[in-house]
Swiss-Prot record:
Entry keyword Cytoplasm: no
Biased composition range(s): Gly residues: 121-142
Single GO BP term: endoplasmic reticulum unfolded protein response
Gene name linked to the record: HSP70
Cellular component GO terms, alphabetical: endoplasmic reticulum chaperone complex
Name of this protein: Heat shock 70 kDa protein
Recorded superkingdom: Eukaryota
InterPro entries tied to this protein: HSP70_C_sf, HSP70_peptide-bd_sf, Hsp_70_fam
Stretch list, region Disordered: 121-152
């Protein structure tokens, strides 16, 4: 007695069309994921910049040297930006970048005045403002990385 068994590889496999469709979907989602990552990065940059400015303003050395009107103007702009962030969690990357440029437009001239008035000194090499435009105003000039303060 003989039994004939035929084994085929087609059972339970995806067809060529299904594989192509899945690859196309993966590509589509890849672009969406990259766009979402860029949006989140822009949001984090704005948030970080606003809170960095707020911390810089709360420093007593900065507080002593800043003009009261400038400090009030900058504090109001920071508060406005933080409120905007809270109200616009799903904003686009461009909206976050636009808000950051707006905040920098107010903050940079004020911080330039502060550093120019002999605040904590600029970067070596005569770069007023202690850094590159668009960079966060560091508490300690010449520092390469972010300043981390541990609070109990």
């Amino acid at each position: 007695k003989t039994n004939k068994i035929v084994i085929t590889n087609d059972k339970g496999r995806l067809s060529k069309e299904e594989i192509e469709r899945m690859l196309a979907e993966a590509e589509k989602y890849k672009a969406e994921d990259e766009a979402e990552a860029a949006r989140i990065s822009a949001k984090n940059a704005l948030e970080s910049y606003a809170y960095s400015l707020r911390n810089t303003l709360s420093d007593s050395k900065v507080d002593e040297k800043l003009d009261a009107g400038d400090k009030q103007k900058l504090t109001a702009e920071i508060d406005k930006t933080v409120q905007w962030l809270d109200d616009n969690q799903t904003a686009t990357k461009d909206e976050y970048e636009s808000q950051q440029k707006e905040l920098e437009g107010v903050a940079n001239p004020i911080m330039m005045k502060f550093y120019g008035a002999g605040g904590e000194g600029g970067m070596p090499g005569g770069m007023p403002g202690g850094g590159m435009p668009g960079g966060a105003p560091g508490g300690a000039a010449g520092d390469d990385g972010p300043t981390v303060e541990e609070v109990d």
